[in-house]
A protein has these predicted regions:
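N-terminal Rossmann-like FAD-binding beta1-loop-alpha1 element of flavoenzymes
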Residues: 11-44, 191-209
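Glycine-rich dinucleotide-binding loop and its adjacent helix/turn
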Residues: 2-4, 83-84, 89-96, 151-216
Length: 303
């Protein structure tokens, strides 16, 4: 049971408390439900207002770039009815997440607290006291036998770069739809900073929506681009063309020079090169304010 008043006398016990309602949290719930009976109680907490994790916040034109049947909780099947090669849209992924949650609710007694931010937990023999805060600021206290922190990478939306001016407008795909009116009424060149999935999806959306418009992409030296049609062809072509996964992973491994770079969101970083003495990750600058998980600097708040 969750109590809004921590001093309340009666507290109902949950078997499991799961923090995070994304793909990690849903898989944790699915596994836990396999060990519990229908009358046992489970509670789910997430800071977002619905199930879906990072997919709730991400840009509207995102696609799931993998066979969608494999992106699920446990062995819960999709109800989309599309070919396995179909690249699921944001809404289709969110609908499947909701379907997974509905299936789990048939297996156990599930209580959900969306819009609640996890704050801390305290363990005692046979019990975990979890403290969270609702979206309106009220304290939320939950007691459970087990706690599963399944918030994954705890990804937050990207803020625009701080470089806007009268002639340059900086936007973030997470807050500005590249297919929206603001972009449509402009005819200037577009510069996409980054070479990951977000950058490639954004460049693809711009090229598709505005044929002939100048689109530039700035990527770092470690960026590796592939052609999906050549690497993972669809239909009968996949029987005699494409690349074996073992060959792909071998090529990627050979491109790695052994250098590891740790970086937080404020930009502080540390590079570990081959042959260098091992140092703890807490040797990042003491001024770092961006911790998300250990091991990190004691004063780093957003990794």
């Amino acid at each position: 049971m969750a109590e809004l008043n921590p001093s309340a006398g009666h507290v109902e016990q949950y078997e499991v408390c799961v923090v995070g309602a994304g793909i990690a949290g849903l898989n944790a719930l699915t596994v836990a439900s396999g060990y519990l009976s229908r009358d046992q109680k489970v509670v789910l907490i997430d800071r977002r207002e619905r199930v879906g994790g990072m997919w709730v916040d991400t840009y509207p034109y995102v696609r799931l770039h993998q066979p969608h049947p494999f992106f699920t909780a446990g062995n819960i099947k999709w109800t989309l009815g599309a070919n396995p090669s179909h690249l699921a849209t944001k809404n289709e992924v969110l609908d499947h997440f909701q379907h997974c949650l509905d299936v789990i609710k048939e297996r156990v007694q599930l209580t959900t607290y969306f819009g609640a931010e996890f704050e801390s937990h305290h363990e005692s023999p046979g019990n975990v006291r979890i403290t969270a805060r609702s979206s309106d600021g009220r304290p939320l206290v939950i007691h459970a036998k087990r706690l599963i922190k399944a918030n994954g990478f705890d990804i937050v939306p990207n803020d625009p770069l701080d470089i806007s001016s009268d002639r340059v407008k900086s936007v973030s795909p997470d807050y500005c739809d590249m297919r929206g009116e603001a972009m449509r009424t402009s005819s200037g060149p577009v510069w996409v900073i980054g070479g990951g999935k977000t950058a490639m999806d954004t460049a693809h959306a711009l090229i598709t929506e505005y044929p002939g418009r100048e689109v530039n992409l700035v990527a770092g030296p470690g960026t590796f681009f592939i052609s999906r049609d050549r690497m993972f062809p669809n239909g009968t072509r996949q029987r005699w063309t494409g690349t074996l996964p073992s060959e792909l992973f071998t090529e990627l491994a050979l491109r790695f020079d052994g250098t590891m770079r740790l970086r937080c969101r404020t930009g502080c970083a540390r590079t570990i090169a081959p042959g260098s003495p091992r140092k703890p990750a807490t040797s990042l600058p003491a001024s770092c304010r961006n911790r998300r998980r250990q091991p990190l600097p004691p004063d780093c708040t957003r990794w």
